[in-house]
From Swiss-Prot:
GO cellular component, as recorded: chloroplast thylakoid membrane; photosystem II; photosystem II reaction center
Pfam families, alphabetized: PsbJ (PF01788)
Summary of the function given for this chain in its UniProt record: One of the components of the core complex of photosystem II (PSII). PSII is a light-driven water:plastoquinone oxidoreductase that uses light energy to abstract electrons from H(2)O, generating O(2) and a proton gradient subsequently used for ATP formation. It consists of a core antenna complex that captures photons, and an electron transfer chain that converts photonic excitation into a charge separation.
Keywords on record: Chloroplast, Membrane, Photosynthesis, Photosystem II, Plastid, Reaction center, Thylakoid, Transmembrane, Transmembrane helix
Oligomeric form and interacting partners: PSII is composed of 1 copy each of membrane proteins PsbA, PsbB, PsbC, PsbD, PsbE, PsbF, PsbH, PsbI, PsbJ, PsbK, PsbL, PsbM, PsbT, PsbX, PsbY, PsbZ, Psb30/Ycf12, at least 3 peripheral proteins of the oxygen-evolving complex and a large number of cofactors. It forms dimeric complexes.
Superkingdom, natural source: Eukaryota
Transmembrane stretches, start-end: 8-28
InterPro entries xref list: PSII_PsbJ (IPR002682), PSII_PsbJ_sf (IPR037267)
Organism per entry: Spinacia oleracea
Family membership: Belongs to the PsbJ family.
GO biological process: photosynthesis
Membrane topology qualifier: Single-pass membrane protein
Protein's name in the database: Photosystem II reaction center protein J
Length: 40
């Protein structure tokens, strides 16, 4: 690992971004499947 003090590692940013995207897409599809997509 390189010196990451004071700087966020790119793999952490990628992991968090991936989780957020998957979460948002999952909530969107779950809402549409439950018939709540119109209320969102």
């Amino acid at each position: 690992m390189a010196d990451t003090t004071g700087r966020i590692p790119l793999w952490i940013i990628g992991t968090v971004a991936g989780i957020l995207v998957i979460g948002l897409v999952g909530i969107f599809f779950y809402g549409s499947y439950s018939g709540l997509g119109s209320s969102l």
